[in-house]
């Protein structure tokens, strides 16, 4: 329903539609609650991969593995690695629960092409230092 309501706006403003599978991993946070999502259990990476693969077969070029804003911990690196291995050229985005350069580096090493941080940046006492820590940790 929301996609149908938004589609005319995408057309009117000539926005590029990004075909993305949005997969919410437990705990899911607010996005899981508001979206009334069926959360993927953290210990079931094969289930996340099945959904991601379905997205690829439906023409989606991006997969977003989302633990939810302010999650206690990020999406497991093992889930990211398995998803990237299975999907290959599909861009993998990982967000939620990323609070350190080390966590970001683990996810990028596992196969994340992009990481998303929000709450951690918003709550940081020194935003510039935090962003510097993240970017220096993930440079390839």
Each model region followed by its residue ranges:
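Catalytic beta/alpha-barrel core
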Residues: 1, 42, 63-73, 118
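Conserved anion-binding
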Residues: 1-58
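Alpha-helix-loop-beta-strand connector modules within alpha/beta enzyme cores
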Residues: 4-18, 73-100, 131-140
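Hydrophobic faces of well-ordered beta-strands that scaffold small-molecule active sites
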Residues: 19-25, 63-65, 92-96, 115-117
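Active-site/ligand-binding-proximal alpha/beta "capping" segment
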Residues: 29-39, 63, 74, 78-84
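Alpha-helical segments flanking ligand/cofactor-binding loops in enzyme cores
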Residues: 53, 81, 105-106
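Conserved, mostly hydrophobic/aromatic
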Residues: 55, 107, 115
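Glycine-rich phosphate-binding active-site loops on the catalytic face of alpha/beta enzymes
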Residues: 67-70, 97-98, 110-130
